[in-house]
């Protein structure tokens, strides 16, 4: 199967952020002649699925990794972002902590304290529970071994869901499906200015069992990940 077989008019990349969604945007956009949007707003997802001939792309990631990456990505933004859910009245999240230049000079343990002081730790769950309500895919099994799946929705709409951790094993499928020569992994932490600070932060942060359980032991994670993968995520952080 390839994207042209779906007979769609537009692509909406709609994710909870920090799941490589920008990589899909920059990889697809040059070769796809029709409309491509990149959002994190579930109201946009809902409105799109009321139309027809759309492909939705959504990704999921270990939420512990995602939360750390989200903190580093948004801590300098002095406005509400596009992470819009019914839980925040579709107003987005305010994540400002400090200018990005200050982040590089701030003690890592102080950054960890600032990370825990913000209010957005469990909005990942809000996003996906509402996502399930909108898409109604929960009764269709997801292939956890493969880690990428296309669902057929009403009105010739389609939903592609991918697991972030399995992108590398699905590169051939992704490149073939979208008729692209290379999948560009943008926003890779290893090439960002704050890569050393980011790595030290992840090495030093301690996430207690309550924090990890609230994000990992959920119907969301059990739908997309095997028990073994979830247990591995638990062990990844002290």
Regions found by a protein language model. Give the residues of each.
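Membrane-interface amphipathic segments in extracytoplasmic regions
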Residues: 1-238
């Amino acid at each position: 199967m390839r994207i042209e077989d779906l007979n769609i008019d537009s692509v909406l990349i709609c994710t909870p952020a920090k799941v490589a969604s920008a990589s899909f945007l920059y990889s697809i956009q040059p070769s796809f002649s029709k409309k491509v949007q990149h959002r994190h707003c579930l109201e946009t997802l809902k409105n799109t699925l009321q139309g027809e001939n759309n492909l939705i792309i959504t990704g999921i990631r270990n939420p512990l990794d995602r939360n750390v990456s989200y903190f580093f990505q948004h801590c300098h933004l002095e406005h509400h972002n596009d992470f819009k859910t019914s839980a925040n009245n579709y107003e987005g999240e305010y994540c400002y902590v400090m200018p990005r230049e200050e982040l590089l000079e701030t003690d890592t343990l102080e950054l960890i304290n600032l990370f825990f002081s913000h209010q957005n730790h469990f909005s990942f769950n809000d996003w996906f529970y509402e996502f399930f309500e909108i898409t109604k895919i929960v009764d269709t099994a997801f292939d956890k071994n493969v880690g990428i799946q296309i669902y057929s929705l009403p009105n010739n709409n389609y939903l592609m869901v991918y697991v972030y951790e399995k992108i590398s094993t699905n590169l051939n499928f992704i490149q073939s499906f979208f008729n692209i020569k290379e999948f560009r992994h943008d926003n890779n932490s290893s090439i960002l200015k704050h890569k050393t600070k980011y790595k030290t932060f992840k090495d030093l942060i301690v996430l207690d069992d309550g924090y990890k359980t609230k994000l990992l032991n959920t119907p969301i994670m059990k739908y997309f990940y095997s028990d073994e993968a979830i247990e591995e995520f638990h062990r990844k952080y002290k």
